[in-house]
Amino acid sequence: MGAMEIERLMGERAKALMENNPDLEIDRSKEEGDWGLLTLREGGTLVGFEFLETEESIGRPDALLQYFDAANDGYYVGVVVPEEKFDDVTDLIYSMGEGQVTVLTYEDLGITPYTLA
């Protein structure tokens, strides 16, 4: 999944989030390693993050640390992964005793990646 694909997925997800909450402000950032970060603000106040991962980026060494740091600071954290990685990522997060991270799939959100790798 390339940079343009991540950009498209971030755009689709941001649009869906804003349809559900028009007061939400969303900053999109494509990160090195072809993963995306949505920073969510409401009324100028930071409320959470969504990490849009690929099959490859989900294995980056600092991914879990980033999720847990944000969640432990009290922010909503969503991690969006390809359907094939859902069980593995969910098991890993819960095996570490962390329940504040929400794992979602692109497919469940109605966002279809053109490629999943």
Feature map (PLM): residue ranges:
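A structural micro-motif
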Residues: 24, 75, 99-101
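Acidic-basic catalytic patches of nuclease active cores, encompassing PD-(D/E)XK
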Residues: 1-33
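Conserved catalytic cores of phosphodiester-cleaving nucleases, focusing on short active-site segments
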Residues: 36-65, 70
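Hydrophobic/aromatic beta-strand patches that form the interior of the parallel beta-sheet core
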Residues: 50, 78, 102-104
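Short, surface-exposed coil-to-beta transition loops
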Residues: 33-36, 75
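Domain-level recognition of nuclease-like catalytic cores that cleave nucleotide substrates
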Residues: 84-117
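Structural motif
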Residues: 30-31, 51-56, 80-84
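Short, charged, amphipathic alpha-helix that recurs within catalytic cores of restriction-modification
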Residues: 60-95
